[in-house]
Amino acid sequence: MEDYKPFFEAIDELKEKSENGWVVVVEGKKDVRSLRAIGVSGEIVVFTGYASTADTLKDRKVIILTDSDAKGMEIEKGLVEALKTYGKIPDVEIKRKIFSNVRKEISKVEEISAFYEKISGIEL
């Protein structure tokens, strides 16, 4: 359990920021369900394209939480650039913290809730 302390801390940080008005951007509906299952209660937006997503979020504090794979990294990079045109610097560190020491077990946001349940012993 101690090995996963950074994972749990990152999840707690995500929940706290979400409760305080930060918008979480994910890749799909399964990602939304996974985050809701672990208690993320704030607004979650599904990525629809760089320009449209950035325009929707231009006046918000944003957390980009895409998968830790090539496609997710590509979306993250493009969305960071699109948000910069509005003078916004999104949070990508929570994603790094979540996936940093669990890459062997999970790489997708939709897998977070099942993994959380497995290692915490808490039924979601």
UniProtKB/Swiss-Prot annotation:
Mg(2+) 1 binds at residues 27, 67. One of its GO terms (molecular function) is metal ion binding. Binds two Mg(2+) per subunit. Pfam families: Toprim (PF01751). The keyword Methyltransferase does not apply. Residues 21-98 form the Toprim domain. Keywords: Magnesium, Metal-binding. Mg(2+) 2 binds at residues 67, 69. It comes from the Archaea. Its cofactor is Mg(2+). Gene3D superfamilies: 3.40.1360.10. InterPro entries: TOPRIM_dom, TOPRIM_RNase_M5-like, UPF0292. Belongs to the UPF0292 family. This is UPF0292 protein AF_0905. It comes from Archaeoglobus fulgidus (strain ATCC 49558 / DSM 4304 / JCM 9628 / NBRC 100126 / VC-16).
